[in-house]
């Protein structure tokens, strides 16, 4: 839902940020597809690369060559913001010095910002298509928005498919 709002406001992923997305189950991937939310994630570079452990075990692929070279040459203290549980140095990539755990929605938000140095409680995350400052509160979904998605698309029948049994 954060990705949808960001796209609608005209945001793009920060070019310094490498993205990957590996939902924990086929059911989760199916729900995102049926809600249309996966389309927004795709536009920000969060295309599904696999189901389950891929990114967290270092299988997300290489960093951009120029970025990796800059990290090494200039001794950049590079960081990752991820929702997986492999948050120790070098686990998801050898060039990553620190990893911060966050909800998937915050991972998407930080992919736009491109830095962990912003204070989301007061700093603008950027400008919208009209040049207006956008803040965390402008893109974070309300309880009502979340409940609407859940009531429309989250059906118990999805939990009892053959795909769910494989998860």
Locate each region found by the language model.
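Mobile "lid/hinge" segments at catalytic clefts and subdomain interfaces of large enzymes
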Residues: 12-14, 54-55, 59-157
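Gly/Ser/Thr-rich beta-alpha loop segments that engage phosphate groups in nucleotides
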Residues: 26, 52-54
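General beta-strand structural signal in soluble alpha/beta enzymes
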Residues: 21, 48-51, 81-83
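A generic secondary-structure signal for well-formed alpha-helical elements
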Residues: 3-10, 45-48, 112-120
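A glycine-rich helix N-cap at a beta->alpha junction
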Residues: 38-52
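Non-catalytic terminal/interface segments that mediate subunit docking, oligomerization
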Residues: 1-32, 36
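Conserved small/polar residues in nucleotide/adenosyl-binding loops
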Residues: 160-167
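Metal-dependent peptidase/peptidase-like ectodomains
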Residues: 29-34, 42, 60-68
């Amino acid at each position: 839902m954060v990705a949808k709002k960001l796209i609608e406001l005209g945001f793009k992923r920060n070019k310094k940020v490498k993205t990957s997305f590996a939902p924990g189950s086929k059911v989760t991937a199916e729900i995102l597809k049926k809600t249309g939310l996966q389309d927004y994630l795709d536009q920000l570079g969060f295309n599904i690369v696999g189901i389950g452990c891929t990114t967290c075990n270092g299988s997300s692929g290489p960093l951009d060559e120029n970025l990796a070279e800059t990290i090494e040459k200039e001794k950049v203290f590079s960081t990752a913001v991820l929702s997986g549980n492999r948050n120790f140095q070098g686990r998801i990539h050898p060039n990553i010095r620190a990893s911060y755990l966050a909800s998937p929605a915050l991972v998407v938000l930080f992919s736009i910002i491109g830095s962990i140095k912003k204070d989301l409680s007061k700093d603008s995350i950027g400008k919208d298509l009209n040049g207006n400052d956008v803040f965390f509160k402008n893109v974070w979904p309300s309880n009502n928005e979340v409940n609407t998605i859940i009531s429309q698309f989250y059906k118990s029948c999805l939990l009892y498919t053959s795909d769910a049994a494989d998860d």
